[in-house]
Amino acid sequence: MAFSMLFTGHAECGGYTKENVARCWTVETGILLDTELPNEIPENDYIKYFAPDFSLKIPGGHIENLNTKSYISSIKVQILENLRYIQHAPSVQMQEVPPDFYIPDFDEDEQNPDVRVDQRSRDKQIQRDDEYFDGDNDNDAS
């Protein structure tokens, strides 16, 4: 089976042969630098990696594509089926994280004047003199 792929298609599936690595990296570097590269490779120490035609781009269609659409589709179905049975890492449920503190809505009109606040609740509202920070950062104080 032969796999004919132009550089424009390589990014979509991520595959290329070792013979074309130099070309792919050159094209990708040109794209990254927003530079249009000529097809002719200048003489350099690495020219042998661009053999046999010593040009940057491979002409499209020089290898006949013998893969039918149904064959490619069946491979895709088989891959997706195999992926379904691969164990994966457990995921964390996405949910909104509440803030570190909670400020309840306090409406004096809704408070019952006949209900008293117990001593324990009042003690929780007192801020100690040796408390330097509002949160868990008080470990930093000495």
Swiss-Prot record:
Protein task: Responsible for the deacetylation of lysine residues on the N-terminal part of the core histones (H2A, H2B, H3 and H4). Histone deacetylation gives a tag for epigenetic repression and plays an important role in transcriptional regulation, cell cycle progression and developmental events. Histone deacetylases act via the formation of large multiprotein complexes.
UniProt region (Histone deacetylase), positions on chain: 14-34
Region (Disordered): 99-142
Chain intervals with Basic and acidic residues compositional bias: 113-130
Molecular-function annotations in GO: histone deacetylase activity, hydrolytic mechanism
Reactions that this protein is recorded to catalyse: N(6)-acetyl-L-lysyl-[histone] + H2O = L-lysyl-[histone] + acetate
Protein name: Putative histone deacetylase 10
Protein family membership: Belongs to the histone deacetylase family.
Gene3D superfamilies with a match to the protein in the record: Histone deacetylase domain
Keyword set includes Phosphoprotein: no
GO cellular component: nucleus
Enzyme class per UniProt: hydrolase
Cited SUPFAM superfamilies: Arginase/deacetylase
Organism: Arabidopsis thaliana
Gene: HDA10
Compositional bias ranges of the Acidic residues kind: 131-142
EC identifiers of the protein: 3.5.1.98
Subcellular location: Nucleus
Gene Ontology process terms (BP): chromatin organization
Alphabetical keyword list: Chromatin regulator, Hydrolase, Nucleus, Repressor, Transcription, Transcription regulation
